[in-house]
């Protein structure tokens, strides 16, 4: 029996356990059985113990998606291997990371809409996103992943975590393609949101002043609010199910939520597992606020 004092809960659907014996790791707890499930999450985002190696061919994700209906456990395993070690440091260039993102988008579209139409949807989306700053943008101005390529890294990290949650019985029936698609598109509202500049920083070691890259905010391109803006963009390219749409809409949870939205949010979380999965995976990928 785990010590409940060491549990961190989100809406009483899933838990994260921080064991005293390994202070640098998290484990997921299934609240229905009070047992430990899943693998260790290293707080250093460059290391995941579930996948034993990086993929030989990133394009294998398409085959994995096509096999999902007959062998979901294989597809989940392949997704883990393909999304393993998702820190921009693990890629020689940001182009390598963007290639993986593109491949995952194509794989999701193929499974959800069929090969011919799915590839058309993916191609339309990727043509658009390549003309934005998505692959170079930070995920925040000064908190999590606040560096060039941070938004891309964060999106891939969320995809890793959300596929891991498929191992929980409560989430095992959710379509893996839906999981990865919402993970990769949940923060599209951040495109064009951060403006780079150089700021003067005093070195603690030398006492000398130097210029470092930093970010400030631009006005929101789509002033609908975080989740709603990402949903608005995603629906321009993909025909989302209600569950997929709600997952993107409510992935910020109760953060900055007005009183009138609380009831709708709780209904969405209760009825649609993917809503909670994206919220939880997003939080697992963030190390600082």
Task: Briefly describe each language-model feature range.
Residues 139-147, 153, 160, 165-287:
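Divalent metal-dependent catalytic cores for phosphoryl transfer on phosphate-bearing substrates
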Residues 2, 47-48, 209-213:
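Tryptophan-centered short beta-strand motifs
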Residues 124-131, 144-156:
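All-alpha helical catalytic cores of prenyl diphosphate-utilizing isoprenoid enzymes
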Residues 2-10:
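Negatively charged, low-complexity tracts enriched in Asp/Glu with abundant Ser/Thr
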Residues 18-63, 67, 74, 78:
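Acidic, low-complexity, intrinsically disordered interaction modules
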Residues 68-137:
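Non-catalytic interface/linker regions that flank or bridge core catalytic/transmembrane domains
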Residues 4, 17-19, 67-70, 93:
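Generic detector of N-terminal low-structure segments
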